[in-house]
């Protein structure tokens, strides 16, 4: 199966893309390093009005969960991880990422009209590769993200039942 065949359905893509956009804004805000409570964040926004985020972002719990999933899956490919961060956290366009990728690309063995040889990839090739890498990254991330969100909901339900049970035992 080729990389171009790894596609999500429209609904899957919209679900994952929505969460990754919220996560990207959360990472960009710096909350990954200093896990702020929402009270502190609101206070900081009132003190520093220029630092107000205009992008919607997820809460700290969702951000940490998504970061754990992304880190666990994307550690395999540092380049794909960098492209994912550039696109979702920094808000870079695919064209801008491809342009940087093109500028820093080293010559590699490629087939072309002149035959096989060592060439620097064209900007169009870089754009296609960035598209393919992002699509493959989303495909690889989808199922672990689904599992993480489902497991978290189950854990919350179990915690609620366990706390209730513990309260009943302590009251006896």
Where on the chain are the PLM-derived regions?
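N-terminal interaction/assembly modules
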Residues: 1-75, 102-118, 122, 132-172
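Residues in the helix-turn-helix
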Residues: 125
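Residues within the helices of the helix-turn-helix
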Residues: 95-99
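A short pre-motif secondary-structure segment
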Residues: 83-84
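Short helix-to-turn junction characteristic of helix-turn-helix DNA-binding domains
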Residues: 87-91
């Amino acid at each position: 199966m080729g990389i171009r065949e790894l596609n999500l359905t429209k609904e899957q893509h919209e679900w994952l893309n929505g969460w990754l956009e919220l996560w990207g804004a959360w990472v960009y805000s710096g909350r990954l390093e200093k896990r702020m409570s929402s009270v502190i964040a609101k206070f900081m926004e009132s003190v520093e009005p220029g630092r107000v985020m205009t992008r919607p972002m997820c809460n700290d719990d969702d951000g940490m969960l998504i970061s754990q999933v992304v880190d666990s899956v994307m550690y395999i490919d540092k380049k794909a991880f960098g492209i994912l961060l550039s696109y979702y956290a920094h808000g870079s366009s695919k064209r801008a990422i491809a342009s940087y990728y093109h500028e820093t690309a080293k010559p590699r063995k490629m087939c072309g009209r002149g035959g096989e040889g060592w060439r620097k990839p064209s900007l169009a090739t870089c754009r296609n590769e960035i598209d393919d890498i992002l699509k493959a990254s989303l495909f690889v991330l989808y199922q672990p993200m689904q599992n993480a969100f489902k497991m978290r909901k189950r854990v919350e339900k179990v915690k609620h039942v366990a706390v209730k049970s513990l309260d009943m035992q302590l009251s006896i």
